[in-house]
């Protein structure tokens, strides 16, 4: 049976590179009716935390990468945390020692002072580890689905530690033991693990176990062509979630980062049947923040308005933004429809829509300086109030005609009149279309806001 795993270390938030690796594992498992397993590699006792484990699982869940077995739901080959599998590693290490394929090594500081196949009791006060014995005369070969046949000469490898002095396994030993007993058929991971693979193959061979099929995926880079890291900007799934990126948009972007597919904008779950590892690029790709934001905007505009409002409310709750919107009201739908055309993220949607949902909006400094403190602003607002009080039909064409009549009657620049009214209604100069905004606000809100702004203008000494 096809079985793939994603095995994060709970030492930080889920990196988008890790999320892409999880996605490719998930896609392959789903396409072949296999199993996708989550395993927590928490043998770094100093840095691993339960909090990060929870956040990693939450990020995967938010992305929609559901798993079939894992630390939270169990399964037939658990436990699914390495810290709960120490006895298994100890048993296998002892098997290697018994067969003289590994040995105890004693260290005094950084110096190895003793080796033996028997536990060195007389060195209890020293650091005692278990090291794997490399057969220097051999070569280690394996097939990589992306890179083809790989061959490494063992003479370039030193004996390496498999059990640390604290009794915990090293990474290279633990993953071999876990992947074997968890019956993992394929290991898809970043190419930064390629140098680890020969050591792991040596352990498989020593134990007489069949190794899984490997695929090492090129890394995601920053714009300076170095591995994507915090110095390039936010890199975690949580960062993008809190920035207002939709889960489906992030999945979509991660999928096209290296996977050649016949279209750019799509729902990843509808593409499961088309996934083919042979269409994954063997070259590293650069993470483009602007491209992701653009792609997110496309997803926002393609969503049913009801679904977008639900996601928007989830985002407001996540950020603790105080904006009470009722998704059942047509007014809410109308606001979101005109606002989403101007933005690419939920964060931007909050900024541009805020003034529609509250009368307690503030005027941005730019509007106050350029318009609110100008002498002619009072005349423009009075004329607008007079004109809109007379207007019966609050449709776009009538609203546009009314505004252009104000410009004509006052013999002022269109921009001056329109921006004065725009800022009066919404407190800012960048908004959805003015005609559309007035139509959505309706007569009552429009007049109330114009009068409020006029009252404020009168308090300025102009």
Swiss-Prot record:
Protein residues bound to ATP: 230
One of the Pfam families matching this protein, by short name: Anticodon_2
Function: Catalyzes the attachment of glutamate to tRNA(Glu) in a two-step reaction: glutamate is first activated by ATP to form Glu-AMP and then transferred to the acceptor end of tRNA(Glu).
Localization (cell): Cytoplasm
Subunit structure, as described in the record: Monomer.
PROSITE patterns: AA_TRNA_LIGASE_I
Coarse class of the protein's main subcellular location: cytoplasm
Motif stretch ('HIGH' region): 8-18
Source organism of this protein record: Thermosipho melanesiensis (strain DSM 12029 / CIP 104789 / BI429)
GO cellular component: cytosol
Protein name per its UniProtKB record: Glutamate--tRNA ligase 2
Keywords attached to this entry: Aminoacyl-tRNA synthetase, ATP-binding, Cytoplasm, Ligase, Nucleotide-binding, Protein biosynthesis
One GO MF term attached to the UniProt entry: ATP binding
Family: Belongs to the class-I aminoacyl-tRNA synthetase family. Glutamate--tRNA ligase type 1 subfamily.
Family matches, as PANTHER family: GLUTAMATE--TRNA LIGASE, GLUTAMATE--TRNA LIGASE, MITOCHONDRIAL-RELATED
Annotated catalysed reactions: tRNA(Glu) + L-glutamate + ATP = L-glutamyl-tRNA(Glu) + AMP + diphosphate
One BP term from GO: glutamyl-tRNA aminoacylation
């Amino acid at each position: 049976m096809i079985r793939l795993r994603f095995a994060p270390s709970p030492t930080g938030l889920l990196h988008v590179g890790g999320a892409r690796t999880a996605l490719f594992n998930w896609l392959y498992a789903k396409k072949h009716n296999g199993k996708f397993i989550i395993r927590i590699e928490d043998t770094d006792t100093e840095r691993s935390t339960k909090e990060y484990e929870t956040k990693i699982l939450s990020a995967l869940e938010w992305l929609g990468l559901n798993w079939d077995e894992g630390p939270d739901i169990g399964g037939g080959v658990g436990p699914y945390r390495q810290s709960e599998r120490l006895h298994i590693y100890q048993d296998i290490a002892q098997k290697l020692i018994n067969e003289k394929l590994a040995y105890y090594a004693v260290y005094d500081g950084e110096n190895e002072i003793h080796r033996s196949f028997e536990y060195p009791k007389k060195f209890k006060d020293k650091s005692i580890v278990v090291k794997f014995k490399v057969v220097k005369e051999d070569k280690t070969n394996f097939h990589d689905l992306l890179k083809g046949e790989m061959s490494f000469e063992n003479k370039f490898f030193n004996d390496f530690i498999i059990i640390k002095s604290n009794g915990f396994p090293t990474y290279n030993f633990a993953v071999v033991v876990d992947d074997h007993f968890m019956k993992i058929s394929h290991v898809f991971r970043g190419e930064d693990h390629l140098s680890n693979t020969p050591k792991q193959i040596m352990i498989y061979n020593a134990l007489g176990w069949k190794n899984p099929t490997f695929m090492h995926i090129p890394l995601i880079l920053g714009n300076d062509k170095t591995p994507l890291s915090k110095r390039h900007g936010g890199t975690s799934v949580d960062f993008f979630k809190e920035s207002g990126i939709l889960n489906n948009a992030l999945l979509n972007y991660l999928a096209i980062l290296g996977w050649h597919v016949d279209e750019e904008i799509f729902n990843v779950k509808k593409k499961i049947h088309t996934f083919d590892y042979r269409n994954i690029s063997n070259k590293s790709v650069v993470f483009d923040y602007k491209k992701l934001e653009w792609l997110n905007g496309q997803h926002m505009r393609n969503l049913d308005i009801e679904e977008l409002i639900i996601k928007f409310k989830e985002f407001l709750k996540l950020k603790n933004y105080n904006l009470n919107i009722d998704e059942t009201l047509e007014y809410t739908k109308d606001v979101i429809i005109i606002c989403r055309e101007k933005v690419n993220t939920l964060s931007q949607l909050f900024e541009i829509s805020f003034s529609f949902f509250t009368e307690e909006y503030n005027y941005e400094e730019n509007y106050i300086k350029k318009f609110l403190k100008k002498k002619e602003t009072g005349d423009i607002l009075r004329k607008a109030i007079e004109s809109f009080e007379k207007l019966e039909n609050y449709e776009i064409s009538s609203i546009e005609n009314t505004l252009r009549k104000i410009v004509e009657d006052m013999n002022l620049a269109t921009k001056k009149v329109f921006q004065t009214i725009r800022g009066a209604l919404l407190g800012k100069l960048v908004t959805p279309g003015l005609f559309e905004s007035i139509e959505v606000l309706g007569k009552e809100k429009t007049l109330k806001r114009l009068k409020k702004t006029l009252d404020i203008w009168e308090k300025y000494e102009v």
